[in-house]
Amino acid sequence: MKRKIFLWHQKLEVFLKIEDEEIINRLKNVLRLKEGESVFFLNNFSEEGEYELLDSKKFIFKRKNLKERDLVPQRKINLYVSLIRKENFELILEKGTELGVYLFQPVISQRSSLKIKEIPSRWFKIIGSALEVTNWKHTPEIKEIKTLGEILKENKENFYLAHKEGEKINLKKMPQEINLLIGPEGGFSEEEEKMIREKTKFISLGDFDSRTETACLVFLSLLNFS
């Protein structure tokens, strides 16, 4: 398996000097990279390059080859996720990236269990790490946190809510770009559901019932790989 490391906002020039302490730690203590050995770097500009370590003290690399990552998923999926428990939300970020999500939109709802107002830097690291095991061209964007009311006012087209009482998903009828809303543990409140029904279409997995994060990943798998 290729040894890959994701670099945010760094172009893959012919010579590359790594200064990020976390990445240096991975190179030294996890990958145990020695001078003359190679590693693959990728970034959020769809680039992937193979690099040889020239200097193990200053962590200077020379590029051996460069390519553009060109794999695109079957559908463009914008995932609107209620702020559920931290570990479950981060699981959706990780696996959603691996499954080809185009955009993540965190949503504050009445039953949100994760109480934050700003995007943690850790979320970007999770996405970067997830991309290391894929060949996707696109790096998912994380939008600023919004309330459910703000989201619904945007009047998105092809907006769907994953809901156990919804119509069973028919993949042949699903559009190429999808806005998929995932509720919190316990679901949305009655008041919220009433607002959502006016703006979205409810879809389900039929008799399949599971945790929020599991249902979300099943939907993504079906939409992009069926």
Go through each PLM region and give its residues:
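N-terminal positively charged helical leader segments and presequences
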Residues: 1-68
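Fold-independent oxyanion-binding glycine-rich loops
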Residues: 10, 20-21, 44, 83, ...
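Structured adenosyl-cofactor binding patch, chiefly the S-adenosyl-L-methionine
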Residues: 190-226
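Active-site/ligand-binding-proximal alpha/beta "capping" segment
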Residues: 159-194, 200-205
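Short, Lys/Arg-enriched, disordered terminal segments
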Residues: 1-15, 154-156, 170-176, 198, ...
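RNA substrate-binding interface of SAM-dependent RNA methyltransferases
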Residues: 70-158
